[in-house]
């Protein structure tokens, strides 16, 4: 075990623990942005920097290991100033039009700017616009990307599909599809993990809400909605309903009230789905050496 002092409090943590983990064990929150435990630990954003007695420079707490006798200051003037400066530099290259962003009020970067009380930014704006076509399944907006590399790491380490990669160098660094392929040619499974872990609105799914609304308002169109089993749980969580409150009948009634002509539950074909996915897995497993074990 390692014994150290953080903000005047003693912490005892297992050897190999980071300062970030040691602080968390005391209930001390150190702001982070690019960090994803066990997935993305590259200290790229430098938001989690802390001051350590005897260290000339500030260090990123997400990668710096706790050491015996270490004295850490997570909220010193020097650490706070560096943290705010680093965030302002990130914001200077970010499209800050939050009112039209799909992640507004659910954005890690927005929350962090509020937490650190970032009101003005003296740094000149350098925002690059390279938005994907609106008809793509997945939408990427370079103007929102902060180069945290979360999407790259979660796709590599969790999904093992390696769709994303770093492109360019220096100030021109960005994220794109590996090997400069078109997104349609990548091995993307459309799992949504990169969207879920993106801290901004740089990645999102295509929004067809306007098309659905138009179809519901058109008397010449018969509208049908088919609900997957997972949705029955997801909608309840979003609205804060209990399992008893979130009945299938209640959900179907809400969809009918919206104007859908027919509402179906995917349960009635679940057996076919299982057979199809099972057959696909057997095919992939049988030919795993040809297609690569990572894609099984």
Per-region residue spans from a language model:
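Eukaryote-biased recognition of intrinsically disordered, low-complexity regulatory segments
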Residues: 1-9
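Fe-S ferredoxin-like electron-transfer domains
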Residues: 46-190, 196, 203-222
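A short N-terminal beta-strand-loop micro-motif at the entrance of redox/enzyme domains
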Residues: 9-15
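Short glycine-centered, acidic/aromatic-flanked micro-motifs in structured strand/loop junctions
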Residues: 8, 177, 227-229
